Design a protein with these regions (language model features):
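C-terminal segment of classical bacterial N-terminal signal peptides
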Residues: 2-9
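Glycoside hydrolase catalytic-domain context in secreted enzymes
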Residues: 10-356
């Protein structure tokens, strides 16, 4: 069963104490608002509970949700807000199975799944859904509640080192396979992350501002289409913007890509996180549609760097450069799928994985 991120907007003051009580307790694995395995009525409660919780957050707590950090235990990590019982976001890379960062967790071993490009070659959507389900089950059992998959990039450059992570050069096949994998991932209390948005087709200069120049028709018919299908049919809780520039503007601060196309045209309801080290500004990025900077104060080489969404974002809000309403929107986009997919009520576990 796949839990869809709700699109309804319900007033926060309609929320009852029972509906938000898990938000007021520490999410430590011992207190649950529902029995293990039960699902929230996502059409009625997720948005309402998210809005109610948002009202209880300070500005500093809201900004804390909008950037991550590198944590030795999880690798990719957003710290919990214990005062309100908001659980940590513990992320694992996962285009071809869960990548475990902590050597103490199952010896960093998980099932090595076939390359996604091979999965797409089967044209088997039921298999793609099983693929996502298995990857997410192992992510959850190794302490993670966000799986950074699937990648629906169009594979057009044979030399691209990560082409195997995508589903090939066909937009329809990429979108439908990615949507099926997302349904499998999110049948667990795990957020799927559709990536890398957009026109991320080669590795050369990817961290040095490589610029993809593309006209409107090609952008919409080739590069946007797999994301459109994935958002419509897979309902991902998150999306990841890419390293590269598109028509001269970094993807993670590109107003046309993130606001006009992804959030307005495609009606994407989740949150946009940056690829790891793909944020280059504070005000331009948050106003351009980026909701969460990852991994915060570390570069892709795990060296300390500038965190644009840490102190600088708080300063920009206090200076009037970024409206509080934009911060609220970004936080709500994170909280809503967290509620809808059960992250507040079914904490990930550390369990041995079965071995053949």
């Amino acid at each position: 069963m796949t839990l869809a991120v709700p699109t309804a907007s319900v007033a926060a003051d309609d929320a009852t104490d029972d509906e938000i009580r898990s938000s007021q307790q520490l999410n430590d694995g011992r207190t649950r608002a529902l029995p293990p395995g039960d699902r929230w009525d996502e059409d009625r409660q997720a948005t309402r509970r998210a809005r109610a919780l948002l009202q209880r957050m300070t500005l500093e707590e809201k900004v804390d949700m909008l950037h991550g950090e590198v944590n030795n235990y999880y690798g990719f990590y957003n710290a919990p807000i214990e005062r309100l019982g908001i659980p940590a976001l513990t992320m694992a890379d996962g285009p071809a199975g869960t990548r475990i960062a902590n050597p103490d967790v199952n010896g960093q071993r998980a099932t090595q799944l076939p390359a996604p490009i091979s999965l797409a070659a089967t044209w088997d959507l039921a298999l793609a859904e099983q693929y996502g389900d298995l990857a997410a089950e192992e992510a959850f059992s190794t302490g993670h509640n966000v799986l950074l998959a699937p990648a629906v990039d169009i594979a057009r450059v044979a030399q691209a080192g990560r082409a195997f992570e995508a589903f090939g050069e066909d937009p329809l096949l990429s979108g439908t396979t990615g949507a099926a994998e997302l349904r499998g991932i999110q049948s667990n209390p795990v957020v799927g992350d559709i990536k890398h948005y957009n026109v991320y087709t080669q590795e050369v200069n990817r961290l040095a501002g490589g610029n993809a120049v593309v006209d409107e028709r090609a952008l919409q018919e080739i590069y946007v289409r797999p994301f459109a299908i994935g958002v419509r049919d897979g309902r991902p809780g998150s999306a990841m913007c890419a390293f590269n520039k598109v028509n001269g503007t970094y993807a993670c601060e590109n107003d046309e890509l993130l606001n006009t196309i992804l959030k307005e045209q495609l009606r994407f309801q989740g949150w946009v996180m940056s690829d790891y080290g793909a944020t280059h500004s504070t005000v331009r990025s948050i106003l351009g549609g980026l909701d969460q900077e990852m991994p915060g104060s570390f570069t892709p080489d795990e060296e300390p760097g500038t965190c644009f969404f840490c102190g600088p974002l708080l300063e920009a809000v206090n200076a009037g450069e970024v409206p509080v309403s934009r911060i609220n929107d970004a936080v709500l986009r994170i909280l809503r799928p967290m509620f809808a997919l059960g992250l507040f009520d079914m904490p990930p576990q550390i369990e041995p994985l079965p071995e053949a």
